Amino acid sequence: MSGDSLRVAMLSVHTSPLEQPGTGDAGGMNVYITELSRALARSGAEVEIFTRRTSSAQPDVVEVGDGILVRHITAGPFEGLDKNDLPGQLCYFSAGVLRTEAARTQGWYDVVHSHYWLSGQAGMLAADRWNVPLVHSMHTMALVKNGSLAPGDVPEPAGRVIGEEQVVEVADALVANTAAEAEDLVTHYAADPTRVHVVSPGVDLETFTPLPPAGADGARDTAAAERAALGLPADRKVVVFAGRVQLLKAPDVLVRALGVMADHGDELPLLVVLGGASGRPTALRELEALAYQVGVSDDVLFLPAVSRSELARWFRCADLVAVPSRSESFGLVAVEAQACGTPVVAADVGGLRTAVQDGRSGVLVPDHDPHRWAAVLRDLLRDDERLARLSRGALEVAAHFSWDTTAEETRKVYEQARVA
């Protein structure tokens, strides 16, 4: 594994990088795997992403770019399986991964990089069989999530906790998005600190770009045209939430905050919810019902998840992007919003403390009390000068994140795991 020669087996059992983020189980991890793979390929690596087939129409292999293949592995029925059902399909999935390597020259892959604990379980077997290092990214951790559950949310099962502990014990290297995540690995899972490496995710600065700065020729017309194209009012503040509609992501906090603002007679922004139900099929309907219950149905626009380029357009046209998650290992959407020059209001949890610089690129809210969120939104949306200052800071913060840097640092982790 010297020079540019590197072959990576990337494992993502429960969600494919080809799926639309913001729907089902697809989210920031999908973007992470896709963008990391692209950056690794630009550095000369070959990446093969193994994921579970969820449709008979999916071909065995999809080439998604130079040096990047997605391999669909049949493991269980294509439809009807919840993520919690997938541990029972890991044997079939692992067998499919091993068969792929068995058809090639021995020693084809240099490293296994697994994502999420399900993939880590399969990765342990593959890395052992191929005698290559296992590098693992948790993305989320059951013990962390269970420590910050929303009322009514279901805790992660003990089987997941045990599975995560096994992966942490066996992995040659663990990649954490932030120092806080690294600390969680050591504190909650007794990870060996010498095997934990902090590598920040990046952001696609070619897709997520700002509008022309205020005062530039045609800037006002461009902004108005962008809003008009999305059907947004030109003279109303807009707050965007982009993500899966589930209790963990806490869009209900925003809806309740709008209800509080309405009760106080405040001028309400338009809240745009971009995303579909995840976990519970009724999650979106329940959020719509909540908006009706608190009297803000006409002030919340529910739309399905959109492509990356369309998401950038929504971010550019928003006055604020809100990320009220109860637990977040990083919060990629927050950095993408800032790359568009849009300040972020986020919960003061986990990786969001790294993704958002409080007072410089956005505001971190210390809890999930709708009254506190209402106060923060009210104060920000009334202060155009402050929004403009935070917008400038958002661009500065986002400029420090790069997928090429992420790939470079990840390759170093691969190298260290190989020689350990």
Swiss-Prot record:
Q: Which SUPFAM superfamilies match?
A: UDP-Glycosyltransferase/glycogen phosphorylase
Which lineage do the record's taxonomy fields give for this organism? Answer: Bacteria, Bacillati, Actinomycetota, Actinomycetes, Micrococcales
State the species of origin: Sanguibacter keddieii (strain ATCC 51767 / DSM 10542 / NCFB 3025 / ST-74)
- Positions binding Mg(2+) in this chain are 315-316, 318, 342
Subunit info here reads: Homodimer.
Q: Molecular function terms in GO for this entry?
A: acetylglucosaminyltransferase activity; D-inositol-3-phosphate glycosyltransferase activity; magnesium ion binding
The family note in this entry says:
Belongs to the glycosyltransferase group 1 family. MshA subfamily.
Binding positions for 1D-myo-inositol 3-phosphate?
A: 14, 25-30, 83, 116, 140, 160
- Domain of life, per lineage: Bacteria
Protein name, UniProt field: D-inositol 3-phosphate glycosyltransferase
